[in-house]
Amino acid sequence: MKSLAKLKAEPGIWLTRTEKPKLGHNDLLIKIKKTAICGTDIHIYNWDEWAQKTVPTPMVVGHEYAGEVVGIGQEVKGFTLGDRVSGEGHITCGHCRNCRGGRTHLCRNTVGVGVNRAGSFAEYLVIPAYNAFKLPDEISDDLASIFDPFGNAVHTALSFDLVGEDVLITGAGPIGIMAAAVAKHVGARHVVITDINEYRLDLARKMGATRAVDVSKESLKDVMTDLGMTEGFDVGMEMSGVPMAFTSMLESMNNGGKIAMLGIPGSDMAIDWSQVIFKGLTIKGIYGREMFETWYKMASLIQSGLDLTPIITHHYNIDDFQQGFDMMRSGQSGKVILDWT
């Protein structure tokens, strides 16, 4: 089958042919229709330090997808041939304390689709049926293919009560932008998002952010004054992994504020703990999506009118994958979709 794989331990990704994956007793075989390029895929493409330590070669990569069930393992119940599905990219062990305690997303033995095992940038993917999510008819393949990062946004945004609250999001990547859209949709008052990438800040405006702030040109304090905010933000979402952004967030939070952190700093990051302690801040680390509460929330948000279509900015046929990766790496895009049909 045709696939995109990390064939060599060097920058790049290659269109190649690999064997069709074998179906296990508890698995689904999925014919891939659409895939989306993730920031993780860019790390793997660039072959940075994280990728070198984490990703085996050769291996088919990718973990954001939508497809159709074309094979069902003999022990699987609840799926039929032709079902449209996306799927959870974190495969969990099922036997550790967190898995058995219903906190599956915190499994200590997680294996990543397209990171530690064969991924979805291929004509076919095999995953455990437990990880598949059946798609409602009104959710398009395009939208379903970005459910993985949308889930990161939803998990982060819904970690704390947002109704009537003022929200600060640092980092206007696709996940940060989708988190802004979720926050407005569920009833936040002001949603302010910061970055230095004007293309993506403009996308955030289209997705409903109250203010999208280029912090290289505009002061966050001035924006708060313009919005009539006198006490700081109630909820923060750190999506950038940039130490300066987190420092700014700590300074801008109201006493008793709550921060959800998804962005991963590139190295050790100094924190002014006096801000955390004297303001009584709560900081929560976010990893992946809650299985599968986040997935049902995602579908419900779209069914209730949340419009994510502006975040999908580019489409390419899989044969033109290099253009898609170049576009993602440029920073001048939202989500980039690769078509396998």
Swiss-Prot record:
Gene Ontology CC: cytoplasm
Cited NCBIfam families: PRK05396.1, tdh
UniProt: Zn(2+) 1 binding residues: 38, 63-64
Keywords: Cytoplasm, Metal-binding, NAD, Oxidoreductase, Zinc
Family membership noted in the UniProt record: Belongs to the zinc-containing alcohol dehydrogenase family.
Domain of life of the source: Bacteria
Reactions mediated catalytically: L-threonine + NAD(+) = (2S)-2-amino-3-oxobutanoate + NADH + H(+)
Note on cofactor: Binds 2 Zn(2+) ions per subunit.
Single Gene Ontology BP annotation: L-threonine catabolic process to glycine
One Pfam assignment: ADH_N
Quaternary structure (record): Homotetramer.
Stated name of the protein: L-threonine 3-dehydrogenase
Organism (species): Colwellia psychrerythraea (strain 34H / ATCC BAA-681)
Site features described as Important for catalytic activity for the proton relay mechanism but does not participate directly in the coordination of zinc atom, chain residue numbers: 148
UniProt: Zn(2+) 2 binding residues: 93, 96, 99, 107
Biological role: Catalyzes the NAD(+)-dependent oxidation of L-threonine to 2-amino-3-ketobutyrate.
Binding annotation for NAD(+): 175, 195, 200, 262-264, 286-287
Active site residues according to the UniProt entry: 40 (charge relay system), 43 (charge relay system)
Main location: cytoplasm
Molecular function terms, GO-annotated: L-threonine 3-dehydrogenase activity; zinc ion binding
Localization per Swiss-Prot or TrEMBL: Cytoplasm
Gene3D superfamilies associated with the record: Medium-chain alcohol dehydrogenases, catalytic domain, NAD(P)-binding Rossmann-like Domain
E.C. designation(s): 1.1.1.103
Pathway: Amino-acid degradation; L-threonine degradation via oxydo-reductase pathway; glycine from L-threonine: step 1/2
Cofactor: Zn(2+)
